[in-house]
Amino acid sequence: MDFPFMKQSKEGEVSGKMGQSVVLTGMVLQTMPIGEYDKRITLLTKERGKVTAFAKGARRPNSSLLAACAPFAFGEFEMYEGRTSYNVKKADISNYFRELTMELECTYYGFYFLEMADYFSQENNDEQEILKLLYQTLKALENPSLPNRLIRCIYELKMLVINGIYPNVFSCQLCGKRENLVDFSVERAGMLCMECAGRERGIRLEDSVLYAMQFIISSELRSLYTFTVSEAVLKQLEQILFGYLQKYVAHTFKSEQFLCL
């Protein structure tokens, strides 16, 4: 299926000039109260990457922007583009991800995914792949047949792929051989073959773990959440990604603490 934001952008139909209205398709990543009734929101958009916007009166109980300016809200946002900021005029929300927010654990995972997308995305940059990944991942959280821990592993690894800092799981990092890959080395950022594994410290992987990582890295976004794994495989995936993120991202995500409760 197509993503809901693959259709023609309306940005040029309203205006692309500063000081006029623009329509951007995106998702609310975070919000912050401003004054008594206003909000400042961070949006990840198809057209302009990450943007910050102000929503006047969005905290009033009768405001049409109350629900539209909440985390996870996805849709089209019509905004006035000023010299240094955007101001939300109205929004047409196509998905609030309400099913996700009805489950506390799913909500915690969702906020972690939003925070990671916020960390990796930039303003005035093409972030469509991150937006697509985020949308697909939140949809997966609403699927009770997929373990949330597996969804997290898939999301983290694919985010690394999009940002070009993913491990090499297709050949040995020391000799380049593509056969008999047995150990994963965080230090080497990838796999080691049987011959080289004796010279380096690594994690001995089950074949299913290697296949899962290869699938996640090479698959299109729409195919990511189409498989499950055993508990043993899942634990190794978690071990690998935890160590890899610690070394190559080295950022503390505040929402991650709630996933350990």
Feature names for model-found ranges:
Residues 2-261:
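Non-catalytic alpha-helical scaffolds and adjoining flexible linkers that form interface surfaces
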